[in-house]
Swiss-Prot record:
Transmembrane segments: none annotated. It comes from Saccharomyces cerevisiae (strain ATCC 204508 / S288c). The gene is AIM32. Disruption phenotype: Increases frequency of mitochondrial genome loss. GO terms for biological process: cell redox homeostasis; protein-containing complex assembly. Belongs to the AIM32 family. This is Altered inheritance of mitochondria protein 32. GO terms for cellular component: mitochondrial intermembrane space; mitochondrial matrix. InterPro entries: Aim32/Apd1-like, Thioredoxin-like_sf.
């Protein structure tokens, strides 16, 4: 039987769920390490020569961005398409083709509001509608609204105002600062004002999310590992009722194996409260252990990057 050391979880914001830290014992860790070393060798054999190799010994930092909303641009095409490998540029803001050119436009109209994350995702199941190839509409899923907004490109500026709700308090570390490796940011809280609010209806989809980084052109390590982790979710039937998707760069590409879980709380009351849990150094062979413990309210400390509560 696997014995686990338990201690109270320390976090900058109280979670809606009750979680405890766990530490995997040495005996189990040694067995995992053997599998990890073999897997890393396999990944490194697939990487382009200019990509830094996957090193399982890199220490995982316990640091995540502070944010209020996560805006996910849905990639067109079925789950067998590979936009995460082909269409997502190294920097998504440089994409000039639809629908990805909407990301730089949206970010520009938001005026650098640091409390809003923007990523592209490619869905791996069919719980919410996805755009078709060459679709004239843009599909944005917004967390914690838990709503899908289908808008026209001409609506982006007003959609930015809607997302920002006219004003937003800036957290201490913006997502862009976080991705660029800045550990510190201004402590000053300021407001960003938009001239107009337009209400977008959206369609509600109350499901948890599993997001796996697979941004190949940002770092081939993530691009190679992401589909392997997706396959492990599917083969092991882990959280099969959750939305499952590959996501563009969320930091941590040096150690790779990055997964975000969004876990709803109080969905029966339509409260849209949820916990955001970030993990790194997740491999196909340790994913089941991570998910089973998470389902039981336990967070494996060795893979935990951090998290926040959202509502």
């Amino acid at each position: 039987m696997l014995r686990i050391t338990v201690k109270t979880l320390q976090q900058r914001a109280s979670f809606h769920h009750s979680f405890k830290h766990i530490s995997v014992p040495d005996l189990h860790t040694r067995a995992q390490n053997d599998q990890t070393n073999c897997y890393c060798q396999e990944i490194n054999a697939r990487l382009p020569s200019k990509t830094d190799p996957l090193d399982p010994h890199i220490k995982l930092p316990h640091r995540t961005p502070n944010y209020n909303k996560h805006v996910l641009l849905l990639s067109p095409g079925d789950r067998f398409a590979q936009p995460w490998k082909v269409a997502w540029n190294h920097n998504l803001d440089t994409n000039t083709n639809r629908p990805y050119n909407a990301i730089s436009k949206l970010r520009s109209h938001l005026g650098g509001s640091p409390g809003i994350l923007i990523n592209a995702v490619h869905l791996q199941n069919e719980f919410i509608p996805r755009p078709k190839q060459h679709d004239e509409w843009l599909y944005f899923f917004v967390i914690p609204d838990m709503k899908l907004y289908v808008i026209k490109e001409t609506d982006i500026e007003e959609f930015a105002s809607f997302l920002d709700e006219g004003a937003i308090q800036a957290p201490k570390l913006s997502f862009q600062d976080y991705l660029s490796g800045k550990a510190k940011a201004s402590q000053q809280v300021h407001e960003v004002h938009h001239r107009k609010l337009t209400r977008f209806q959206g369609e509600t989809f109350l499901r948890d999310w599993n997001l796996v980084c697979g941004h190949y052109k940002r770092d081939a390590k993530c691009g190679e590992m992401g589909p392997d982790i997706i396959a492990a979710f599917q083969d092991e039937k882990l959280f099969p009722e959750n939305n499952l998707a590959l996501i563009s760069h969320i930091g941590g590409h040096i150690f790779a194996g990055n997964v975000i879980f969004y876990k709803l709380f109080g969905r029966e009351k339509m409260q849209n409260k949820l916990d955001s849990l970030w993990f790194g150094k997740v491999y196909p062979h340790n994913l089941k252990l991570l998910c089973e413990n998470l389902e039981n309210g336990k967070i494996i400390d060795e893979m935990y990057r951090g998290g926040i509560s959202m509502n």
